Amino acid sequence: MARIENVTAELLHDESLVNVVVRVRDSDGLEGVGEAWWGILDPERRSRTASPIIAVINDMLGPRIRGREADAIERLWFEMWDWGYRYADQGIFLMGLSGVDLALWDLKGKHLGTSVMALLGGPVSDGIPGYASLPPLREPDRLIAETARAMEAGFAAVKLHEIDPELTAVLRDEFGDAVEIMVDVNGHFDPLQAIAVGRRLSELGVIWFEEPVRPMRDHAAIARVGASIECDLAAGENEYVLEDFDRLLATGALAYLQPEITKIGGLTAARRVSTLAELYNVALCPHNFRLGPSLYASVHWAFTSPASRWIEVPWMPDGEAFSFPAALPPMRNGQVLPLEGPGLGCG
């Protein structure tokens, strides 16, 4: 069996985000490529906030698994988790572990000449609806233009990151029912504000209202909002461990669960989270806002769960480009199609 020779993390920049790319090289000369969470969105601080995550990978996890059999993913995951639990069971440590785990799955698929999806049991469907996840645009004209571009690219749904519900109204007036709309406010409101906004979004017929309150992990507040509005709620990108997902789902407030694969421990942990979504009969919609290994891993994961309903596909405004050299996942008639690999299939 090939053994792990090197584990490294590096930072890539694009116009609005960064990617923390993780590479695991083995004794046969093959390289698996993964991705960790990258810190915060603030352009002035995003590189600095990614630095601790990179340090976890380069200084802690990499040395820990160097020399080990590369295909023993489950064993390596639990050993890293058990060792790192004494450091922190969430946050920065788990973000780093996620990136290493994705790289190991990519490496295993490349060794076997097959896709990660096949390693996980194969797809349960021929396609999953994809939506274009737009960045915050704030201006009606830009919002209309980017939605039109996304529709021309084959998307039948878009997600807005706009806190003003009247911007959603502008889009509905422009396109009518020709496009499905989701709205993510990234925990901008207190519960009373969220209820007022949620009622307006309900009138506009949105698919879901995402992360309505701050703190984003205030499960009681999420449940309060959900009980007071008609449109469905989505949340989960800021949960980390299985117990927290269980507590969130137990509120009964969610219609859509949105785990972030680069925060929860990678694909190894993701499989357990999707089982939980199935048990609670809640739709699985993996969160993602980067083009690269994390998006591809989310697609592989989504296709192996019968709970999957939507795939989030990041969308860059006209004239901007992602830093990672990968194409968007294949689509047809608004549906994301299964990926072929080998490995994750993106590099």
Predicted regions and their residues:
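N-terminal small/glycine-rich loop or linker at the start of catalytic domains
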Residues: 111-136, 167-180
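Catalytic domains of carbohydrate-active enzymes, especially glycoside hydrolases
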Residues: 149-158
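Conserved, mostly hydrophobic/aromatic
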Residues: 29, 61, 100, 113, ...
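Metal- or metallocofactor-binding catalytic centers and their adjacent structured scaffolds
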Residues: 25-111
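Catalytic core of soluble alpha/beta enzymes
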Residues: 160, 165-293
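Active-site mouth loops of central-metabolism enzymes
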Residues: 127-142, 184-191, 234
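Flexible C-terminal active-site loop/helix
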Residues: 2, 12-14, 27, 100, ...
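Structured beta-strand/loop patches that form or line metal/cofactor-binding pockets in enzymes
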Residues: 1-33, 37-44, 320-324
